[in-house]
Amino acid sequence: MAAGAGARPAPRWVKALGEPLSAAQLRRLEEHRYTAVGESLFEPPLQLYWTWLLQWIPLWMAPNTITLIGLAINLVTTLVLIFYCPTVTEEAPYWTYLLCALGLFIYQSLDAIDGKQARRTNSCSPLGELFDHGCDSLSTVFMAIGASIAVRLGTHPDWLFFCSFVGMFMFYCAHWQTYVSGVLRFGRVDVTEIQVALVIVFMLSTFGGATMWDYTIPILEIKLKIVPVLGVVGGLIFSCSNYFHVILHGGVGKNGSTIAGTSVLSPGLHIGLIIILAIMIYKKSATNMFEKHPCLYTLMFGCVFAKVAQKLVIAHMTKSELYLQDTVFIGPGLLFLDQYFNNFIDEYVVLWIAMVISSFDMMIYFTSLCLQISRHLHLNIFKTSCQQAPEQVYKHID
């Protein structure tokens, strides 16, 4: 027998790791066209700044490179803050807050011009859209942690939990309604306004110190740190009312279904499972795991969220069904089982194991996804080239 003649094909699960998308999904991805609707309050004046900034970006720099640089800066500056404030109750050196403000501002700026650079270099593609949203999903987690540290929200664990997960929920809902309607909608108060508000919070902590947020407001008898929290609550109500108005009024698919022809409520199972697991593990912890390690806890669930959000984005782009079964839930599942068996293993140890599993699972999926799409569309992820995929049609309807 000739060498290799009897070789068996790789198991299905091994192939899925390297090629998450099927041939049919890749064909539908080629047909995807990005469509955005609406304009936020700060967008018109900031367009002048973004246009000015774009002229300093060399034409050879790929849009995805710009996005990744911004994300890396945002992550590194937030990790410095986490190092000084692991329980979100400490006061960090003033320069760490300033560093976070600068990091978030740079991230926002680069995130805003990556699409402009893509159109400028005629390199718009589904890969760029996926890469941008994937980075945004991870940045959402770090922004929530950084802002919570800036106001020392760890002194109020329940509010800290709420603010740590509400950003994930709102980000998911924004893409949930996109999966239903086929259109990404920007509200009058959207991510740009939130980022500007967070930069202001970091600057206030820089010059006033994190302890300034412990000041009790006369008459109202609430601490100053609760004011931005109430702003988050108001933003949640305002944004989600718009998101669910779109979701519950039916999608563009057959009989009011999603763009993939599935139930408009089906994506809610994924974010619902994440939040339910997070709440159950938080409240049932015998060692007060969330109170002692809020940053690690949020980052672990943040990795789970980031992968699920990426799957929702690619499901929209490929008009595919979103399946609940996923290896990324292994991490939270280990924590749940450990509690079920009366903490057979130290919760802190299991939390670290869950963090490693969830982060690697998320990174492997996102890397495999980008590599598969780049091969199929004959694109270089971090370089502009003469041979590009067919340009997307960008529609921005006011």
Swiss-Prot record:
Question: Where along the chain is Mg(2+) 2 bound?
Answer: 111, 132, 136
Alphabetized PROSITE patterns for the sequence: CDP_ALCOHOL_P_TRANSF (PS00379)
**Keyword Lipid biosynthesis attached:** yes
Q: Where in the cell is it found?
A: Golgi apparatus membrane
Enzyme class, spelled out: transferase
Catalysed conversion reaction? CDP-choline + a 1,2-diacyl-sn-glycerol = a 1,2-diacyl-sn-glycero-3-phosphocholine + CMP + H(+); 1-octadecanoyl-2-(5Z,8Z,11Z,14Z-eicosatetraenoyl)-sn-glycerol + CDP-choline = 1-octadecanoyl-2-(5Z,8Z,11Z,14Z-eicosatetraenoyl)-sn-glycero-3-phosphocholine + CMP + H(+); 1-hexadecanoyl-2-(9Z-octadecenoyl)-sn-glycerol + CDP-choline = 1-hexadecanoyl-2-(9Z-octadecenoyl)-sn-glycero-3-phosphocholine + CMP + H(+); 1-hexadecanoyl-2-(4Z,7Z,10Z,13Z,16Z,19Z-docosahexaenoyl)-sn-glycerol + CDP-choline = 1-hexadecanoyl-2-(4Z,7Z,10Z,13Z,16Z,19Z-docosahexaenoyl)-sn-glycero-3-phosphocholine + CMP + H(+)
Residues exposed to the Cytoplasmic side: 2-62, 119-125, 180-190, 249-265, 317-329, 377-398
According to its UniProt record, in which tissues is this protein expressed? Expressed in brain, heart, lung, liver, spleen, intestine and muscle. Down-regulated in kidney of type 2 diabetic KK/Ta mice.
Q: A GO molecular function for this record? A: metal ion binding
Question: What InterPro entries does the entry give?
Answer: CDP-OH_P_trans (IPR000462), CDP-OH_PTrfase_TM_dom (IPR043130), CDP_ALCOHOL_P_TRANSF_CS (IPR048254), CHOPT (IPR014472)
Establish whether keyword Chloroplast is in the entry.
no
Residue positions where N-acetylalanine is found in the record = 2
Query: Which N-terminal residues, if any, form the signal peptide?
Result: none
How this chain sits in the membrane, per its record, is: Multi-pass membrane protein
Keywords assigned: Acetylation, Golgi apparatus, Lipid biosynthesis, Lipid metabolism, Magnesium, Manganese, Membrane, Metal-binding, Phospholipid biosynthesis, Phospholipid metabolism, Transferase, Transmembrane, Transmembrane helix
Query: Which cofactors, by name?
Result: Mg(2+); Mn(2+)
Report which superkingdom the organism of origin falls in.
Eukaryota
GO CC terms, sorted: Golgi apparatus; Golgi membrane
Q: List positions binding Mg(2+) 1.
A: 111, 114, 132
Instruction: Return the similarity comment.
Output: Belongs to the CDP-alcohol phosphatidyltransferase class-I family.
What is this protein for, i.e. what is its function?
Answer: Catalyzes the final step of de novo phosphatidylcholine (PC) synthesis, i.e. the transfer of choline phosphate from CDP-choline to the free hydroxyl of a diacylglycerol (DAG), producing a PC. It thereby plays a central role in the formation and maintenance of vesicular membranes.
**Protein name as it appears in the record:** Cholinephosphotransferase 1
The organism is Mus musculus
* Gene symbol of the encoding locus: Chpt1
